[in-house]
């Protein structure tokens, strides 16, 4: 079976027996009051199973789990759920890992997914992917980082920022879900500046079409626009990005508006920062020292 080759999500609540999460099961709603969109949970990787629990267990981390209000899994009707193909219903819930690399000068790296990818094409996300059997979360994240960007990090410190429940397509208006993930966002801090790491960037053009380093001020605008519908204070007109053109990185300017886009409710997707990435940026900012920024 395909599921035997993947690390899947397993659930336990109120000391119940550990069970493999079902594809059409809302994970966040399972642990939140009144089927809400956020919950604090305990989680950890055990024997190739990603365990989520409402109780602490050996080696677990306590973090926030969240999903968007428009989550397709949450909004599936019983009839829609029953109409899912059997191979989809039997998939379970996959585990993804995404690495928010922070330089010593407080910038984080995002990559734009290639337009040729089937899932979330042309969307800005941190480097990441699936956890393979036998891997630990950090090990999987650093492997994906190297495969996608060419960056190989040696001495790092890290922590788990939070979990995000993700489905694709991201809205029911674009079709029934065919993928369901719990994405584990890891903050990986290095002792290098972003310029030092940028010199070693060598993205795989099959997966990545551009890279950008975001500082805290830009991140605050992005998060504020997602939360309130408008950025906090004056905005730069553009952001400098590194576009991958014919195998080489070239610096160019990208409109700031692109990074404030939200997922359209209907029609084709657009270039934007993924909703889960905005959530991860908000958690990153929450952990930063308070300053006098107008967005603080």
From Swiss-Prot:
Mg(2+) binds at residues 144, 148. Its EC number is 3.6.1.62. It is an enzyme of class 3 (hydrolase). Its cofactor is Mg(2+); Mn(2+). A motif (Nudix box) lies at residues 129-150. Coiled coil: none annotated. Keywords: Hydrolase, Magnesium, Manganese, Metal-binding. It holds the Pfam family NUDIX. Belongs to the Nudix hydrolase family. This is m7GpppN-mRNA hydrolase NUDT17. It comes from Xenopus laevis (African clawed frog). The lineage of its organism: Eukaryota, Metazoa, Chordata, Craniata, Vertebrata.
């Amino acid at each position: 079976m395909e599921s035997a080759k993947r690390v899947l999500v397993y659930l336990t609540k109120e000391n119940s027996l550990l069970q493999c999460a079902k594809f059409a099961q809302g994970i966040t709603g399972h642990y939140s009051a009144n089927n809400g969109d956020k919950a604090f949970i305990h989680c950890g990787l055990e024997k190739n199973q990603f365990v989520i629990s409402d109780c602490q267990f050996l080696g677990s981390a306590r973090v926030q789990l969240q999903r968007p209000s428009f989550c397709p899994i949450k909004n599936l009707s019983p009839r829609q759920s029953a109409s899912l193909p059997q191979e989809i219903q039997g998939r379970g819930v996959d585990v993804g890992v995404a690495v928010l690399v922070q330089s010593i000068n407080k910038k984080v790296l995002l990559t734009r997914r290639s337009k040729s990818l089937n899932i979330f094409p042309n969307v800005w996300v941190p480097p990441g992917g699936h956890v393979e059997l036998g891997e630990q979360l950090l090990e999987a994240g650093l492997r994906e980082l190297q495969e996608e960007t060419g960056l190989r990090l040696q001495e790092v410190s890290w922590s788990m920022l939070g979990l995000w429940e993700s489905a694709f397509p991201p809205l029911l208006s674009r079709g029934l879900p065919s993928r369901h993930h719990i994405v584990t966002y890891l903050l990986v801090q290095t002792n290098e500046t972003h310029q030092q790491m940028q010199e070693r960037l060598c993205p795989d053009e099959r997966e990545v079409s551009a890279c950008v380093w975001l500082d805290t001020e830009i991140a605050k605008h992005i998060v504020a626009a997602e939360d309130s519908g408008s950025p906090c204070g004056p905005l730069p007109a553009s952001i400098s990005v590194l576009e991958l053109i014919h195998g080489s990185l070239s610096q160019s300017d990208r409109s700031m508006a692109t990074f404030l886009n939200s997922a359209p409710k209907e029609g084709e997707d657009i270039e934007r920062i993924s909703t889960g990435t905005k959530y991860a940026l908000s958690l990153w900012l929450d952990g930063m020292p308070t300053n006098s920024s107008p967005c603080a």
